Structures are given as C-alpha cells and as structure tokens.
C-alpha cells in the first residue's frame, strides 16, 4: 500500500556534552590567565625588591667607601715624618729659624687639633711650608706685611693662602698705643668685636672679610718685623689675635696663641696686656704659648687679674 504523500521526519539531536565542554574550556582559560597574571605579579614584585635591595647595598658600599676615604683623608702624618720635618727645619742655616723645641710645641698642638684645624699665621718665615704641611688636613692662612714678597711667595707656592696687610704702627710707639687701647677697652678697642668694623688703633680691619668669620683654632704671631724702632712691631698682630680668639662664635671655645720672639719688650708688653699672664701655659726658648677662651660680648677686660686687683684696691683708696 502506498502512502498518498511524502512525510519527512526530522530528528533533532541534543548533545548536552558540547555545552559542558565549552564551559569547561572557559574555566581552563580563566585558570590559565589567572596563573600567568599571578606569576607576572610575583615576578614584578621580586624584581622590584631586588632593585631596591641592590640600590641599598650599593648605597651601603658607597657609604663605606666614602667613610674609608674620609678617614684616610683626615689621617694624621706619621710621627716619624713629623719628627724628620722638624729635625731638618731646625738645622737650617737661616739665622732667624725657630729651634726644634719651639717648632715641636706648635707641632704638638696642631696634631691634637681636631680636623679640619684652622691655623692663622702672622708672617711669612722660614717655617711657612712646615706649618702648611703639618696642618695638611685643615686650613692655613698667612698674613704678610710685604705685598711684593707675599705675591712672589704665592706665585712659587700656589698652594699657600697668603694676604698682605699694611701696618701703620711703629715699634717705638708701643707703650703709647697700648695705653690708648686700654683707655678705649669699653668702646672701639673692646676684647670682643668684629674687627672688620673696628676703629681701634691696633685692630687690623683691612683683611679679607672671610678671615674675620673663621673660628681660628691656632694663631701664631711671628710677624711683622719687630727688631727696631721704626719697624711696625707686633702690637697690632698680638691685639688682633687676642680679639679673634675671644670673639669666636663656634667651634672649640679655646684658642692656642703662640708669640715668637717673646724676649723682646714689645712682644712681652702686648702679651701681658692682651693675651694675659694667667693664660700663659708654656714658654719654650723664644716662644710663648697662651690658651685663650672666648668671652661674653659685653666683656670690657682682656685680663681677669687686672679686674680683681682694681676691686681689691678700691676700698683702701
């Protein structure tokens, strides 16, 4: 029997496993991406930590190297080298050179001075290069009366810092000048002041400005000339040293002041009046060694002993 029409039967097959497979693939893809994301982040963090650690290590090494270099820079000269320098300097044929004992007194103070040590020297002498060498870790400045010699010396020794100054005094006028300064001790010649603006007859006010700003640890007075009545004498250099020492604003409150040729009348007179006997700690051959402390800005007396004497004698007057 034949059927009367075409009947097409269509079958729709549903494969549920395909949908499940797609979901599973997405999960695997998500897991894969997440894994690599976490791995990337961990790698980035590790790299950053490594860079920071490397920088810190480099900084530590650099700091250690700098510290070692600094320590080496401020190291002192060997004792044997210093003794050799003093020995040969004292053996000079120059009749105006210092003795071994005098140079050693100054050398010992420079060795104990904490670097950087500030050394001020009045006068270019036979020992100039010695002082510069002994204070190789600090600053050394020289003050010279002869401008031509100062320029010549600086030309052949460019490492030397020297300034010329014009002295207006005469050694034969020492007592009159000292008396005038004592009378003006409460005004223009007071012991604590900025000499750059001073009108005191014995104050040096024409040095470079920065010289007055330095806190000098050691001052050596070995100039200007003082071996005659018409030479400048050392009244101004001793007075200036006394004021600089007492007017310090920082650093070590004590200043070592050395005066050479202390046997002469002018050096002894000015030493007693401005540096004071109570501050004299040593006298070696022709060299006097004082230790001065900075004073209050309102001070009007260079020496404490004189103030006491006046207070004792006033009741009996």
Curated annotation (Swiss-Prot):
The keyword Transmembrane applies. Keywords: Golgi apparatus, Membrane, Transmembrane, Transmembrane helix. It holds the Pfam family IRX15_IRX15L_GXM. It is found in: Golgi apparatus membrane. InterPro entries: IRX15/GXM/AGM (IPR006514). GO terms for biological process: plant-type secondary cell wall biogenesis; xylan biosynthetic process. Required for xylan biosynthesis, but not directly involved in catalyzing the addition of sugars to the growing polymer. This is Protein IRX15-LIKE. Disruption phenotype: No visible phenotype; due to redundancy with IRX15-L. Irx15 and irx15-l double mutants have a mild collapsed xylem phenotype, irregular secondary cell wall margins in fiber cells, uneven distribution of xylan in the cell wall and a lower degree of xylan polymerization, but no visible growth phenotype. The chain crosses the membrane at residues 27-47. Expressed in roots, rosette leaves, stems and siliques. Expressed in the xylem. PANTHER family: OS11G0490100 PROTEIN (PTHR31444). It is a single-pass membrane protein. GO terms for cellular component: Golgi apparatus; Golgi membrane.
């Amino acid at each position: 029997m034949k059927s009367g029409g075409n009947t097409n039967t269509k079958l729709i097959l549903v494969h549920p496993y395909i949908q499940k497979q797609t979901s599973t693939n997405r999960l695997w893809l998500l897991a894969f991406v997440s894994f690599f994301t976490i791995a990337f982040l961990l790698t980035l963090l590790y790299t950053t930590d490594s860079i920071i650690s490397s920088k810190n290590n480099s900084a530590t090494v650099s700091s250690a190297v700098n510290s070692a270099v600094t320590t080496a820079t401020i190291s002192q000269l060997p004792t044997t080298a210093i003794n050799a320098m003093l020995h040969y300097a004292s053996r000079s044929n120059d009749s105006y050179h210092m003795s071994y004992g005098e140079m050693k007194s100054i050398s010992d103070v420079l060795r104990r001075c904490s670097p950087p040590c500030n050394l001020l020297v009045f006068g270019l002498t036979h020992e100039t290069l010695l002082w510069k060498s002994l204070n190789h870790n600090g600053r050394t400045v020289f003050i010279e009366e002869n401008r031509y010699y100062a320029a010549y010396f600086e030309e052949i020794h460019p490492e030397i810092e020297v300034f010329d100054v014009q002295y207006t005094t005469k050694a034969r006028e020492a007592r009159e000048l000292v008396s005038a300064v004592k009378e003006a001790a409460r005004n223009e010649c007071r012991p604590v002041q900025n000499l750059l603006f001073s009108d005191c007859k014995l104050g040096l006010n024409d040095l470079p400005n920065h010289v007055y700003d330095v806190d000098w640890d050691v001052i050596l007075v070995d100039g200007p000339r003082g071996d005659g009545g018409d030479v400048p004498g050392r009244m101004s250099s001793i007075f200036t040293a006394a004021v600089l020492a007492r007017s310090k604003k920082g650093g070590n409150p004590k200043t070592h002041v050395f005066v050479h040729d202390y046997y002469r009348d002018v050096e002894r007179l000015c030493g007693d009046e401005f540096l004071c006997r109570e501050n004299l700690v040593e006298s070696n051959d022709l060299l006097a060694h004082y230790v001065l402390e900075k004073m209050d800005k309102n001070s009007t007396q260079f020496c404490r002993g004189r103030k006491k004497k006046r207070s004792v004698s006033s009741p009996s007057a």
